């Protein structure tokens, strides 16, 4: 270690003395600096994937002096190499089958006169692009109109010849899809459904009438089984209210001609309520009628149970004796 100069010394004397090697030329001691092109050529193998033979050649060319003179020729080929690889990968992807079908249908509708029906026109509107396919048709017509009159007769001749074989092909193609959907069977099921509705209405009416008849018979015979009704006699189940109403009507007609006319000229205001009650028999109300029916059913039930009870009593009394 060398001692530093005193702090009071001038700044020139404070500096350390230089080594003898420092007096040499600094450029001679430093290594030669490579240019950017050389460095790119040397590092190209790290970033660019090429064929095994091309990497060595590129490295040798970059190290030589020729690479410095023509730097634009070397980076071109490796930069273009990855592009075809991506194109190949895209071409290898399989297309969807539905996309192929759509493309074929679009081509068929564009080529020929496939717009015979409404369905074809709808499909054509769906598949046609925004004016791409419709643009060439008016252009050809405009060109034919704008042309000279001498060229007009010459153009339709050759144009008509290829048009003749082209038109039948799309017509046949359009006929095939039109024959596939069966339009006439559509209204047939509708007619069948209408017939079914009419039958269902008749069935409902018949069922309704049958239900009403069953309810009438049920209430007429008090809900008893047909065997019990036949045993008791159907004549006993006639509705008494009908007979009563008939009698009331006949009595009212008779009194209107005799009773009221007799007392109309007298001092009395007419037949009083007591006289009407005496002349017209009292009609049973619905509640009273139902009560009588319930009482009668209860007596019938008791009559059926009594023989069984008597038999059980006799059986129980025999061992006691």
Swiss-Prot record:
The modification Phosphoserine is found at residue 241. Keywords: Cytoplasm, Cytoskeleton, Microtubule, Nucleus, Phosphoprotein. The keyword Phosphoprotein applies. Detected in stomach, thyroid, trachea, adrenal gland and testis, and at low levels in prostate, ovary, intestine, colon, spinal cord and lymph node. Residues 169-181 have a biased composition (Low complexity). One of its GO terms (cellular component) is cell cortex. Residues 1-84, 111-203 are annotated as: Disordered. The keyword Phosphoprotein applies. Residues 15-46, 131-145 have a biased composition (Basic and acidic residues). GO terms for molecular function: alpha-tubulin binding. GO terms for biological process: positive regulation of cell migration; positive regulation of phosphatidylinositol 3-kinase/protein kinase B signal transduction; regulation of cell projection assembly. It is found in: Cytoplasm, Cytoskeleton; Cytoplasm, Cytoskeleton, Microtubule organizing center, Centrosome; Cytoplasm, Cytoskeleton, Spindle pole; Nucleus. Interacts with AKT1; the interaction is transient and follows AKT1 activation. Interacts with PPP2CA and alpha-tubulin. May play a role in microtubule organization. May play a role in cell spreading and cell migration of epithelial cells; the function may involve the AKT1 signaling pathway. Belongs to the FAM110 family. This is Protein FAM110C. It comes from Homo sapiens. The lineage of its organism: Eukaryota, Metazoa, Chordata, Craniata, Vertebrata.
